[in-house]
From Swiss-Prot:
Cofactor dependency: FAD
UniProt-listed Gene3D superfamilies: D-Amino Acid Oxidase, subunit A, domain 2, FAD/NAD(P)-binding domain
Keyword field: FAD, Flavoprotein, Glycoprotein, Oxidoreductase, Signal
Source species of the chain: Aspergillus flavus (strain ATCC 200026 / FGSC A1120 / IAM 13836 / NRRL 3357 / JCM 12722 / SRRC 167)
Reported function: Nonribosomal peptide synthetase; part of the gene cluster that mediates the biosynthesis of imizoquins A to D, tripeptide-derived alkaloids that serve a protective role against oxidative stress that are essential for normal germination. ImqB is a canonical three-module NRPS that assembles the tripeptide backbone of the imizoquins via condensation of Trp, Tyr, and Leu-derived precursors. N-methylation by imqF and phenol oxidation by imqC, followed by cyclization via the FAD-dependent oxidase imqH carry out the three-step transformation of L-tyrosine into tetrahydroisoquinoline.
SUPFAM superfamilies in UniProt: FAD/NAD(P)-binding domain
Reported induction: Expression is down-regulated by ralstonins, lipopeptides produced by the plant pathogenic bacteria Ralstonia solanacearum. Expression is positively regulated by the imizoquins cluster-specific transcription regulator imqK.
UniProt-recorded name of the protein: Amino acid oxidase imqH
Pathway recorded for this protein: Secondary metabolite biosynthesis
Gene: imqH
Tagged with keyword Oxidoreductase: yes
Lineage of producing organism: Eukaryota, Fungi, Dikarya, Ascomycota, Pezizomycotina
InterPro entries: FAD-dep_OxRdtase, FAD/NAD-bd_sf, MTOX
């Protein structure tokens, strides 16, 4: 189908900004008038420099970039994106290669999965990573004992590290050298600049509070004509019109649609430890990896470009995946965040003197994780790194998620409004790594054509199936 004559994109996050950039580079949209709307003024000093939005989920120092997905389509997309991260998208320090160690608790990595073991998720991820590395054990290799895990972390082997055999349940995992992390805040600012300097996108600052629904004119009307979304309503009462509205407002998307069950919207706590320059250099020297501990449901990234060691919890969807491989059905979260909650959908720093019990509990988990890593009173040669375990958190941040039940994105036309409203949301805590390729695929889905680009394993039909609008909300009207 031809590109619409006028397009509004609501939201300048991962989905919205990548779409705007891709449209600016796609000749199919050369005649389209494209407007990108966000409430945040990214260019307060003029168009030559962009400042990240501190309330956005992507305002962060680091995001893990890896391609070991069990689903072929995601794996294909992730590998394509990773190649771009290693080129211009990750230039100037925006992407850095760093190996990842994924660990869980259970029996030998070489044994079949056993019920109730968190190591099952790790075994599955290892199998995918090993195959995609061409079965090259120099790139992906097993850590089949607690001692091997500690050696891979570069932190020495604790005196109490288990020396048990393969039939004992202990900490095990694997290391993948084909991974890294990206500085998300800097990347989004860079992409804004590329998009602005294309001179193809109009930037509009404003808070969208609703979608404008229109009916066909009398000359075009017919029985049972479906309504159309013909633009947006801003908080100052003004309206902007377009043939196509792309709603990519992250955690705010369900609220704007009036579809609270479209995504599970909730927040988690992220904490940062400021490393000294000596600690940063020492961790780099020891080839300290990215760490994903599925037993603890915690992952760590660092040292980053600001010298932080970042600690975060699995999203609920990630936790559910781990439990699924252990044979445990955890179902949906028990409590949804009320949409009228103060600060709903807005990320930001937390006042550490006024933390809720839930946040305090999470920080205690992080502290325990750090004490395990940088322990004292054992044979490990840690030197001054032990101080990391007890240092106060330099920053505690609230981060919002928009999970789908399947963890698949929602990138599709809203079925109740024809081809006038397109939804791009449901990042489920894994969308950022696809940033270099996501906008291109969204454009293909808008045009309902792959323009000959997509291969047989990632056809437009497969993406339409994978990212379709969920049936339960398909007839929700604005």
């Amino acid at each position: 189908m031809p590109a619409p004559k006028s397009i509004i994109i609501v939201g300048s996050g991962v989905f919205g900004l990548s779409t705007a950039h891709a449209m600016s580079q796609n000749n199919e949209f050369a005649s389209s008038k494209i407007t990108l709307i966000d409430s945040w003024n990214f260019e307060p000093s003029g168009p030559s420099a962009s400042a990240p939005n501190p309330s956005a989920a992507n305002f962060d120092t680091s995001r893990i970039i890896r391609s070991d997905y069990s689903h072929r389509t995601y794996a294909t997309l992730a590998r394509e994106a990773q190649q771009k991260w290693k080129a211009d998208w990750g230039a100037d320090g925006r992407y850095r290669n760093q190996s990842i160690v994924m660990i869980g608790e259970g029996h030998s990595m070489k044994q079949p999965m056993k019920a109730l073991e968190s190591i099952n998720y790790v075994k599955h991820a290892y199998a995918q990573s090993y195959e995609r590395a061409g079965r090259n054990s120099d790139i992906v290799h097993i850590l089949d004992s607690e001692s091997a895990v500690w050696e891979a972390l570069g932190l020495g082997t604790p005196d109490e590290a288990s020396k048990a055999g393969p039939n004992a349940s202990e900490l095990r995992g694997y290391r993948n050298h084909n991974c890294g992390w990206a500085e998300s805040g800097a990347t989004m600012a860079w992409l804004r600049q590329k998009t602005i300097h294309s001179d193809r996108i109009d930037i509009h600052i404003g808070q969208v509070v609703g979608l404008r629904v229109c009916s066909d004119s009398p000359s075009e009307s017919h029985v049972n004509a479906e309504p159309r979304v013909c633009g947006v309503i801003l908080d100052d009462g003004s309206q902007l019109t377009a043939d196509l509205t792309v709603l990519a407002a992250g955690a705010m998307t369900p609220r704007l649609l009036g579809s609270p069950t479209l995504c599970d919207v909730y927040s988690e706590t992220v904490a940062y430890v400021q490393l000294t320059e000596m600690e940063r250099r020492e961790l780099v020297r020891r080839e300290f990896p990215l760490i994903v501990n599925v037993a603890r449901k915690i992952f760590a990234i660092g040292p980053d470009n600001q010298g932080f060691l970042k600690l975060a919890r699995f999203s609920w969807s990630g936790y559910r995946d781990v439990q699924k491989f252990a044979g445990v059905d955890v179902g949906p979260r028990s409590q949804a965040a009320p949409q009228e909650e103060d600060g709903y959908g807005a990320c930001g720093d937390l006042d550490q003197t006024k933390l809720s019990p839930d946040v305090e509990s999470t920080l205690q988990d992080y502290r325990g994780f750090l004490r395990e890593l940088f322990r004292s009173g054992d044979g490990g040669d840690l030197g001054g790194l032990r101080n990391i375990a007890t240092r106060p958190f330099a920053q505690v941040r609230r981060c919002w998620y928009a999970d789908t039940v399947s963890t698949d994105f929602i990138v599709d036309y809203h079925p109740a409004y024809g081809k006038s409203l397109f939804i791009a949301t449901g990042g489920s805590d894994h969308a950022f790594k696809f940033l270099p390729v996501l906008g291109e695929r969204i454009c293909e889905l808008i045009l309902q054509s792959d323009n000959g680009k997509a291969g047989p394993s990632e056809s437009i039909q497969e993406l339409q199936r994978l990212w379709k609008f969920p049936g339960g909300d398909s007839h929700a009207k604005l």
